[in-house]
């Protein structure tokens, strides 16, 4: 079947090349903002945090799909350190491995980093991002904290009354929907602890490819969640030249797909065959990723990816606690007195909610490429089973996103033998 798919993709590629009548030049690459030394340092720290947090979440049996923005998580830690005192503040910096940086360096550096890497215009991606800190109706946020958190982290603030829980949840979800232009209609159906502060990050991210998928190269296929469970999904296909590596020893493939303006790339790691991702996740470290990427070579690759929107909400509270953020979430120990002027507040939840859209859009493809000899026998990267993916900034090496797709939206198709 895969041989047939490969032949079909090659024929479609040639046919589509002939269909394009007028050559269209790709958009000029964007210009990356030069980061300061403190922002560069925090980019490195946030990447380390990305792998630590991902590994912690991957071990949670209750978690299927994972979708994290390490930049946004780092900003959440910065916000806690801004509003905290003593050990509560120092723990937040320690989780970010920023203990040796002055507070002002952390806040200005993180602010600069997020503004630069989430600049949708410069990067030609769609990234809608909002952060809001909800406090109990009995608590008032201090003016200095409101001003500083808005300046550095673009964080909004609001009181919320959970006496009417249904109305409170509706308010949170409506804000998230408005922030993402309706792409993320719901953050959560429930809040367990309602006597503390809720930090909510709501995001919508849509990569625009350096070379788009053609809209005709889309069809319905099966995605094997496990060997015995398959769901129906829409798949998109294209053949092009990509950085690619096949680790035959570890039985996995990597492909790097540049995004429009080539300031960032999407990297996908996938086992050769359907299997739980636990084996790959044990291999995945910052250093191992660097090693794999160093072995990549430009090759012709026929890529098939699921098409659609993946919506994921994580309450990061317990996972951050596992990395060392224990005081801020403890009602009896938290000192967030810079937030409210009193030691009367703790962090009850850290909601990290994202809608990530896999779509065909991007720069016009170069139709001349399909006449080249090197595209005659492409490698096949058929993502019809669970995989890990990362969106990486090519200048700083910082990760905009890290995640895994285990169960896309779709109805059960059949049981496999």
Swiss-Prot record:
Induction: By heat shock and retinoic acid. The record marks 376-377 as: Reactive bond homolog. Glycans are attached at residues 119, 124, 394. The modification N6-succinyllysine is found at residues 93, 295. One of its GO terms (cellular component) is membrane raft. One of its GO terms (molecular function) is collagen binding. The lineage of its organism: Eukaryota, Metazoa, Chordata, Craniata, Vertebrata. Its main location: endoplasmic reticulum. SMART domains: SERPIN. Residues 1-17 form the signal peptide. Belongs to the serpin family. PROSITE patterns: ER_TARGET, SERPIN. This is Serpin H1. InterPro entries: Serpin_CS (IPR023795), Serpin_dom (IPR023796), Serpin_fam (IPR000215), Serpin_H1_serpin_dom (IPR033830), Serpin_sf (IPR036186), Serpin_sf_1 (IPR042178), Serpin_sf_2 (IPR042185). It is found in: Endoplasmic reticulum lumen. A motif (Prevents secretion from ER) lies at residues 414-417. The modification N6-acetyllysine is found at residues 206, 318. Keywords: Acetylation, Chaperone, Endoplasmic reticulum, Glycoprotein, Phosphoprotein, Signal, Stress response. GO terms for biological process: chondrocyte development involved in endochondral bone morphogenesis; collagen biosynthetic process; collagen fibril organization; protein maturation. Pfam families: Serpin. The modification Phosphoserine is found at residue 140. The keyword Cell membrane does not apply. It comes from Rattus norvegicus (Rat). Binds specifically to collagen. Could be involved as a chaperone in the biosynthetic pathway of collagen.
């Amino acid at each position: 079947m895969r041989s047939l798919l490969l032949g079909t993709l090659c024929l479609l590629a040639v046919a589509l090349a002939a269909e394009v009548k007028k050559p269209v030049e790709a958009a000029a690459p964007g210009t990356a903002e030069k980061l300061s030394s403190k922002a560069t340092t925090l980019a490195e720290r946030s990447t380390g945090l990305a792998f630590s947090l991902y590994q912690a979440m991957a071990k949670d049996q209750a978690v299927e799909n994972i979708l994290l923005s390490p930049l946004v998580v780092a900003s959440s830690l910065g916000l806690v350190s801004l509003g905290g005192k003593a050990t509560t503040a120092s723990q937040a910096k320690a989780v970010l491995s920023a203990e040796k940086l002055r507070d002002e360096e952390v806040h200005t550096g993180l602010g600069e980093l997020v503004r630069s890497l989430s600049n949708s215009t410069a990067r030609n991606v769609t990234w809608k991002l909002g952060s809001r800190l909800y406090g109990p109706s009995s608590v008032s946020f201090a003016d200095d904290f409101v001003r500083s958190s808005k300046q550095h982290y673009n964080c909004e603030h609001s009181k919320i009354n959970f006496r009417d829980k249904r109305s409170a949840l509706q308010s949170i979800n409506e804000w998230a929907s408005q922030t993402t232009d309706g792409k993320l209609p719901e953050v959560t159906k429930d809040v367990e602890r309602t006597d503390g502060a809720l930090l909510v990050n709501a995001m919508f991210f849509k990569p625009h490819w350096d070379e788009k998928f053609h809209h005709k190269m889309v069809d319905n296929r099966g995605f094997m969640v496990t060997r015995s469970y398959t769901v129906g999904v829409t798949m998109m296909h294209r053949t092009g030249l990509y950085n690619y590596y096949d680790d035959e020893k570890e039985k996995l493939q990597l492909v790097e797909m540049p995004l429009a303006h080539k300031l960032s790339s999407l990297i996908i790691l996938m086992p050769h065959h359907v299997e739980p991702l636990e084996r790959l996740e044990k291999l995945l470290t910052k250093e191992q990723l660097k090693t794999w990427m160093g072995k990549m070579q430009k090759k012709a690759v026929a890529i098939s990816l699921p098409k659609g929107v993946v919506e994921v909400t994580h309450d990061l509270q317990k996972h951050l606690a596992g990395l060392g953020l224990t005081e801020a979430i403890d009602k009896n120990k938290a000192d967030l007195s810079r937030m409210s002027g009193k030691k009367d507040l703790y962090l009850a939840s850290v909601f990290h909610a994202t809608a990530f859209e896999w779509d065909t859009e991007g720069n016009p493809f170069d139709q001349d490429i399909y006449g080249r000899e090197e595209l005659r026998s492409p490698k096949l990267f058929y993502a019809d089973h669970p995989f890990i993916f990362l969106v990486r900034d090519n200048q700083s090496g910082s990760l905009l996103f890290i995640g895994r797709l285990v169960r896309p939206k779709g109805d059960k198709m059949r049981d496999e033998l």
